[in-house]
Every structure is written in structure tokens, then in C-alpha cells.
Design a protein with these regions (language model features):
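Thiamine diphosphate
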Residues: 1-98, 240, 244-280
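Glycine-rich ThDP/TPP pyrophosphate-binding loop and its adjacent helix/strand module
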Residues: 53, 57-244
């Protein structure tokens, strides 16, 4: 709810449980019991993220391509706010917009138009991670989708990097490279495996939009050296890492809000206008 936070858009909205899990781990008002109500009528963990229903969700997504365009719009908003209100000693708007996008998103016409505009405007604060697992609900994505996605985005004027999307260090390195861009939006092509670690369903269309099943889940956990019988279990050391990240984020938030207070003291008219815009 504070102005200069980074934005995150899950354009591939069908992967909503990823967002809900991270919101829970990072201390948002979303309990473990609510995660267990995933996709149930009346729950705060619906099958696609919904703005205003689940704390921490920036925008509703689901219709393919919509989230991609939402991300471009958010990046344009950051550019506008920075150009309007920033002063040399007060960079009160300099946040990033991150999005996870899918094959289905990039098939849709709206993503083509939005990507072209983002490249034209040079939205350097926009970083999209494209989950390229080469699978659709019908089978291999190549049945209907064979275009050169990296080449298309380079033609739009984007920075493009291709990585192993199952390698966390590679993802971090690519994001940092994208943050170094000052004139182009970024597309990180993450080559991944659907149902990663599943002995029988990895890289199979059967894992698209359907549960693995209890037995396959057990086998997958065993293959990944995870306690096979535990459900909704988070290792204590992992929880500590997330809690440390929350503390760091809170410190960053406090620092940036203090910057806005100092800005208001020096530029009261601009701060008043910003307040009116923020209140709608």
C-alpha cells in the first residue's frame, strides 16, 4: 500500500498458489489454513489472483495476456510519477515492475501490442520472466506456437537473456543484469520443466492444470529429498530466511517513507498534488 514499492504481476494467473505461498511466508495476512482452502468457493485463495480479495495481490489476472499488459501499464505509471514528482535529491519513485508470463500470454495479441509499446518507450524498470516449459494443455506447445520469442522481443527493443529457469542462482544473476539496463525493458527467458522432479509427469501435458496425485507427489518428494509424508511443511531455516527478508523490506519501506516526508517539507505543493492523486 506504500507508493514506491516494487510491483509484481503473475500474468500466468493459473499459477496463483505460488503467489499465495510466498505471501504467507513473507508475513502477509494469509494463513496456512487459507492455503489449504485453495480454489474453494468463498476462500481468499482463488484459482487466479484477485485484487482486493487477497492481501498483497497487485492486480487481478487470469485472461491470458492481460497481466502482461498490466505490467506494462504499471511501468508506464512509474515513469510518469518519476517524471512528474522526482527531484534530483528526492528520487521518491524508482521502483521496478516484475512479471511472470507464460507461453499462453505471449500467444495473445494483447501481449504483442503491449510489448511493442514497452520497447518503444524504453521502460527500463520492467522485468518479465517468461516461463518457457514448452508444454500446453493439449501437449507440446509447438503444436500451435513455434515462433522465435527471444528474436521477437529483441526486435521490439527489449534486453533478452535466456537461462535455466530451474537454477535459482541463474535467475538472480539475470534479474541483476536486467536491473542494470537503463534504456530497455527486459525479458528473461526461463527454460523450465513442468512438474519438475516428478518421476512420471515431468515435461508431460498431464501435469498442466491437473494434480499429480498423492502417489506421484510422494515419489516426487522422495526424488527431491523432501519428507515424503509431510504436508504444508516449511523447514525452520527456510522460514527464518523469509522472515529476515521481511525485516529488510520493512527497513527499506521506512527509509523510503522518510524520504517522502522530507520531500513534502521541501516541495509542499507537489506533495499535496501527489496526495490527491494517490487518494483518487
Amino acid at each position: 500500500s506504500w507508493p514506491n514499492r516494487d510491483r509484481f504481476v503473475l500474468s500466468a494467473g493459473h499459477g496463483s498458489i505460488l503467489v499465495y505461498s510466498l505471501l504467507h511466508l513473507t508475513g502477509y495476512d494469509l494463513s496456512l489454513e487459507e492455503l489449504k482452502e485453495f480454489r474453494q468457493l468463498g476462500s481468499r485463495t482463488p484459482g487466479h489472483p484477485e485484487y482486493g480479495l487477497t492481501p498483497g495481490v497487485e492486480t487481478t489476472t487470469g485472461p491470458l495476456g492481460q497481466g502482461f499488459a498490466n505490467g506494462v501499464g504499471l511501468a508506464i505509471a512509474e515513469r510518469f510519477l518519476a517524471a512528474t514528482f522526482n527531484r534530483p535529491e528526492f528520487p521518491i519513485f524508482d521502483h521496478y515492475t516484475y512479471a511472470i508470463v507464460s507461453d499462453g500470454d505471449l500467444m495473445e495479441g494483447i501481449s504483442h501490442e503491449a510489448a511493442s509499446l514497452a520497447g518503444h518507450l524504453g521502460l527500463d524498470k520492467l522485468v518479465n520472466l517468461y516461463g518457457d516449459n514448452e508444454i500446453s494443455i493439449e501437449g507440446k506447445a509447438m503444436i500451435t506456437f513455434t515462433e522465435d520469442v527471444p528474436g521477437r522481443f529483441r526486435a521490439y527493443g527489449w534486453y533478452v537473456e535466456e537461462i535455466n529457469g530451474d537454477d535459482l542462482e541463474a535467475i538472480e544473476h539475470a534479474i541483476r543484469s536486467a536491473q542494470g539496463e537503463t534504456e530497455r525493458p527486459s525479458l528473461i527467458v526461463c527454460h523450465t520443466h513442468i512438474a519438475y522432479g516428478s518421476p512420471n509427469k515431468q515435461d508431460a501435458a498431464a501435469a498442466h492444470g491437473a494434480p499429480l496425485g498423492d502417489e506421484e507427489v510422494r515419489r516426487t518428494k522422495e526424488k527431491l529429498d523432501w519428507p515424503s509424508e509431510a504436508k504444508f511443511w516449511v523447514p525452520e531455516e527456510a522460514l527464518m530466511v523469509f522472515r529476515e527478508a521481511v525485516e529488510n523490506g520493512q527497513q527499506t519501506q521506512t527509509s523510503l517513507l522518510n524520504l517522502v516526508e522530507r520531500y513534502a517539507a521541501v516541495y509542499p505543493d507537489e506533495a499535496a498534488l501527489l496526495g490527491r492523486l494517490w487518494e483518487g
